[in-house]
Regions:
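Terminal-appendage/accessory-domain detector
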Residues: 1-155
Length: 155
């Protein structure tokens, strides 16, 4: 019953979301269209869908009904605001505004949130060593060395 979805941003606020028509799950991590599709299709973001090699054509067709507009006022660099408008085929509209979503500078992830995200790709002992290196050092080098050793950082 959804005709289209409009995602409203302040100017330039979607710079990290560089893919409007992602073809892989990895590209989908940087696509508001793919995230909105997941929320509408499944009720929440499905992390495993970011691992798929090819996004199905039917999903890409659906994402073409999701558009971006830049009609919100500019905000401070630490602020995040997004408005989503869903327009149904019968003309009804529903709008929701999100200020500072989880993971944004003013609403950071908790250590447990970070553990869960890392757990999607790393083993528990790797996560423990990374967090230990991060928490108990004032120097960047030991932390980066741990990331390299765990195969997370490749530079």
């Amino acid at each position: 019953d959804i005709d289209r979805v409009t995602v409203h941003f302040p100017p330039g606020a979607d710079a990290a979301l560089r893919y409007t028509s992602p073809t892989t799950g990895r590209e989908g991590q940087f696509s508001i269209e793919y995230v909105v599709y997941q929320v509408l299709a499944y009720g929440a973001v499905q992390d495993e869908l970011f691992k798929i090699d090819t996004i199905d054509q039917s999903v890409r067709d659906y994402m073409s009904r999701i558009e971006r507009v830049y009609d919100l006022p500019k905000v401070a660099q630490t602020e995040r605001i997004t408005k989503v408008t869903v327009t149904l085929k019968n003309g009804d509209t529903f709008t929701e505004t999100v200020n500072n979503p989880k993971g944004s500078p003013n609403n950071p992830l908790t250590l447990e949130d970070i553990r869960i995200k890392l757990g999607l790709t790393l083993k528990a002992d790797q996560i423990d060593r990374m967090i230990e290196a991060f928490i108990h050092t004032n120097e960047v080098d030991p932390f980066l060395q741990t990331l390299r050793k765990e195969g997370v950082l490749h530079v």
